[in-house]
């Protein structure tokens, strides 16, 4: 069934824009380098036509602690995601995550997720679902810190990725696979990108990330296909970044 653009853009907001000199093939390993900061802007399109919205990403690092902000502005939707976590090399430890969405005719939704690793418990607060707690029995991620771990694994040359996380109030596992490479046109030029697909049970839905080795494994495009009639994508317009 066809879904309106505001619904699809809202779905795409669950796909944070991270997580990731010479272009190298997918099987090659690259030495890991941590991110110091990122300022990026993405254009939003619906069925390959401009949707009149932009998404902005900022990443800031201080003493191996990261603050990430992702904002989208659209005539039908305003949304924001924030995350704070620590990183020692590829060991990513989430501390907090929050998300808010305000859509036309749908009101506002708010979610906060806090990780207490000393007591091994995570607490989720949601203005619609109430409070929920989770036992941290393993290295869980939130929807943003997950992509920093994925960037490490892609730089190591991994082809199949799997991560436990707390997502939409539930314990879940997200799986991804590198399916090839593709050239992507962006506001900064053309880049050869690794094509990373999320593995889903519903084959009609498809989420694809395009990760550019030439830009130190940062994402240059995200595409979410809800059905054969509806696809939302976010493509890099500009980016300024630095590695540590």
Indicate residue ranges for each PLM-predicted region.
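Bacterial N-terminal signal peptides
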Residues: 12-23
